[in-house]
Amino acid sequence: MTSSNLIKQLQERGLVAQVTDEDALAERLAQGPISLYCGFDPTADSLHLGHLVPLLCLKRFQLAGHRPVALVGGATGMIGDPSFKASERKLNTEDTVNEWVEKIRRQVSPFLDFDCGDNSAIAANNYDWFGGMNVLTFLRDIGKHFSVNQMINKEAVKQRLNRDDSGISFTEFSYNLLQAYDFACLNKAHGVALQIGGSDQWGNITSGIDLTRRLHQQQVYGLTVPLITKADGTKFGKTEGGAVWLDPKKTSPYKFYQFWINTADADVYRFLKFFTFMNLEEINALEEEDKNSGKAPRAQYVLAENVTGMVHGEEGLAAAKRITASLFSGDLNDMTEADFAQLAQDGMPTIELTRDADLQQALVNAELVPSRGQARTMISSNAVAINGEKQSDPEYAFTDADRLFGRYTLLRRGKKHYCLISWL
């Protein structure tokens, strides 16, 4: 992306929900590089897919020559943002928050370039300026610039105040002031002139703009990216198992890859604009190719490869593709021991068996059949596979050759019902 018309390019990709003083911001960007920031609160030990669009937006600005600041909220994470939350967040201990801060800092780092000259990225933590601030300083230097009347009229706060079952605590009510002061601090320390965030952050961002103007007499700007929804109206970034995380220990590269493979045709080309750096001409050409090919669309695989490779690297992408191909073909020869561990992590039904168990018992224990009698019937009808190979002998006893890496056997009943055996 070029800097001269960056806002327009972001809009063409559907990446702008709201922007303050668009003409003035476009003019400022055309004059030369700026510093901008996006904040990530450590409310869990990993970022999830909802964080990916603003994080990639930081990267888009850096590629256009601007300097990104990734702010991890060591202070704000101890309170929790009430914006559009139905109830108050659980408060985590300082040790927990500090641990999560470090994990998220490491997670953000690969997306940005911290050693590229004048626009090298900066990592910041708002605990650095809030940790030593006392309550009198906070009230005198920050609180006096805020009108309670305006604060309670912000949509995110109004929604909580209007709920019969829960109001809002003073702790969460004060969050808006803390995030606003982040903007003012980063403006003073690094010349930050733009904050980006999800559209639920609009009220916090505009508060920061007002406070920066009052404290430093500087004109600064805000830009929000849309909260992503799917064409069918359901939430993006959720599966039956919960959120899709960027941490491979919480969502494996294989499961992450499968999430994108399962993207609906109605969403996939839009998601290519949001989550990849393919130019619009490439995306439009791919859409046209898929429409005219008469085959299953390629777009989901392009999306899955792009995003999985970006988040999990070449090794993670290779593992995801290897597992996908192996399960589809039934040929498990290319799978590694770590690949089988990924399947267990991802929630594939897994059982432990002693080495004297036969195939009938394994099917019953795996809950692939209700009884040994039913197991005999399924095996005899050629409906059971061991490591991808059909087995029709109802009296079959496992051999060492069935125990891949000495410990794993993959059972399949029919085409879709799997269970992984971990041998004791």
Swiss-Prot record:
Binding sites annotated in the UniProt record for ATP: 238
EC number: 6.1.1.1
Any one GO molecular-function label of the UniProt entry: tyrosine-tRNA ligase activity
CDD domains the UniProt entry points to: S4 (cd00165), TyrRS_core (cd00805)
UniProt enzyme class: ligase
Highest taxon listed in the record's lineage: Bacteria
Annotated compartments: Cytoplasm
Residues given in the record as L-tyrosine binding sites: 37, 175, 179
Role, per record: Catalyzes the attachment of tyrosine to tRNA(Tyr) in a two-step reaction: tyrosine is first activated by ATP to form Tyr-AMP and then transferred to the acceptor end of tRNA(Tyr).
Similarity comment: Belongs to the class-I aminoacyl-tRNA synthetase family. TyrS type 1 subfamily.
Protein name (database record): Tyrosine--tRNA ligase
Natural source organism: Yersinia enterocolitica serotype O:8 / biotype 1B (strain NCTC 13174 / 8081)
Lineage: Bacteria, Pseudomonadati, Pseudomonadota, Gammaproteobacteria, Enterobacterales
Gene name tied to this protein: tyrS
